[in-house]
Amino acid sequence: MITVTREQKNGVASIKIAGTIDEHVDLQKEIGPLPAQVNVICREISQINSLGVKAWIDFFSQAAHHQIEFTFSDCPPPIVEQLNYITNFSCGGHVVSVSVPFTCENCHKELRGTVKSEDLKKVFYKLPPIKCPKCSAKALFDDVPEEYFAFLIRQGA
């Protein structure tokens, strides 16, 4: 089940999707018609299964076919995983930013931070540590950069 929140600013729609995308989700019904430009905020997507992937590709492929320009922002690990596994998962949309996992070296708190795709290229996909809000120690990126950002590296983003 998902929840969708829509907002319009300067002619660009923002659509925030939260929850699990699976066989029970009808993206056309949940999201509805799209304007000419849309930013899809993915941060709160918690899971996507194989039938959810099919629904996603069907929906965004149709949007691309109708000349709708769309971007994806705050892509969380479940979406990043699909972007890495399925070449056309973005259906021609541009990934603006990625939500990345960090783990504190001291207290082992799991954190997420958002990084712009263009900034990742500037640092060669190597993220500096961030400060843990719980204990102030260093939190390190908790994955292999070449694997987690493979879809961006392939695109040259």
Question: For each predicted feature, which ranges?
Answer:
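Short beta-strand/loop segment at the start of cytosolic alpha/beta domains
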Residues: 1-14
